Amino acid sequence: MKRIKKGKFYVVKRHPGFIISADEQKNKYLAVVTGTSKDTRHKTQLNHPIEPGVKESYVKNRPVLGKKKHFGSHELVGLRFHPDDMPLVEEISRRKPQKLK
């Protein structure tokens, strides 16, 4: 079985998601979902992109709570948050999460 690790990026509904907390016993994973869509409703633009070669990245204003089946099986390599954007990510991670169906 795959193991989802805290602090890594995985696919969440076709978008990169940064795992904030992982509880394997209860099968609950909390993630902040990012993307590059210009539709800025319910999203905040990051100061620096998370991918090389992309002009701008966005992050959803609420984290998502899901089970292991909601996340992709492979870690997304090469993605990272800039240290200037981490306070925003930590603030979003404390908000009430949306549950994935």
Model-derived segments and spans:
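C-terminal terminal-subdomain/extension
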Residues: 49-101
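Mixed-charge, Lys/Arg-rich low-complexity intrinsically disordered regions
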Residues: 1-5
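Compact nucleic-acid interaction/catalytic patches
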Residues: 6, 13-52
